[in-house]
Amino acid sequence: MRTIVVCSGGLDSVSLAHKIAAEQQLIGLVSFDYGQRHRKELDFAARCAARLAVPHHIIDISAIGGHLSGSALTDDIEVPDGHYAEETMKATVVPNRNAIMLAIAFGLAAAQKADAVAVAVHGGDHFIYPDCRPGFIDAFQRMQNEALDGYASVRLLAPYVEVSKAAIVTDGEKHATPFAETWSCYKGGRLHCGRCGTCVERREAFHLAGIPDPTEYEDQDFWKAAVSQYSAAEVR
């Protein structure tokens, strides 16, 4: 299938891009600038597109993102430290973010005669982000079937929606994903902080997958204390 991947530049979406390139016909990556403080991730998405020799579309929706206030990812609100399973991580929710981005991606896919849009939502996101859950994926597909009826037929591929981030690391290694060429940290510093929810989840995923983590973190050991109170089953 001719497929466009929504790629933030993070571990999940870059791994997905490599998977789609190996298993489908990857025709491009689409990324979004929504005013996120960690927009350096877009550079890693661009590197992925160059590596896979496909076009890279960066859609500027920062004007919209500026109105979706109240998130630590876009506003002057401190990004909380700790495990993704903690209630404080809801501060990183950007309301309706995936619905907005996917609607644009589907429009792009229809215009380019693509067969599918692929997105890297995964099981570890379910606790915090409602627009990463299977119910949302299914409902969005039904909505797009109506929105594009008679014009285009575009599938929403979400191969990781029921699996853990550790499983994505395993799949990424299978498809030769260069993990060092991905960015996860929400704080957007020179290095991954090692303390925010996505850094902790990233470090834990490599540990659970039994695959060496090439990432350099400012705090190499914080993740151990952060995950010690949760079992893998409780957060996935």
UniProtKB/Swiss-Prot annotation:
Keyword Zinc listed: yes
Residues that bind ATP: 7-17
Disulfide bonds: none
Reaction(s) the record says it catalyses: 7-carboxy-7-deazaguanine + NH4(+) + ATP = 7-cyano-7-deazaguanine + ADP + phosphate + H2O + H(+)
EC code: 6.3.4.20
Cofactor binding note of this UniProt entry: Binds 1 zinc ion per subunit.
Pfam short name (any one): QueC
Protein name per the record: 7-cyano-7-deazaguanine synthase
Taxonomic classification: Bacteria, Pseudomonadati, Pseudomonadota, Alphaproteobacteria, Hyphomicrobiales
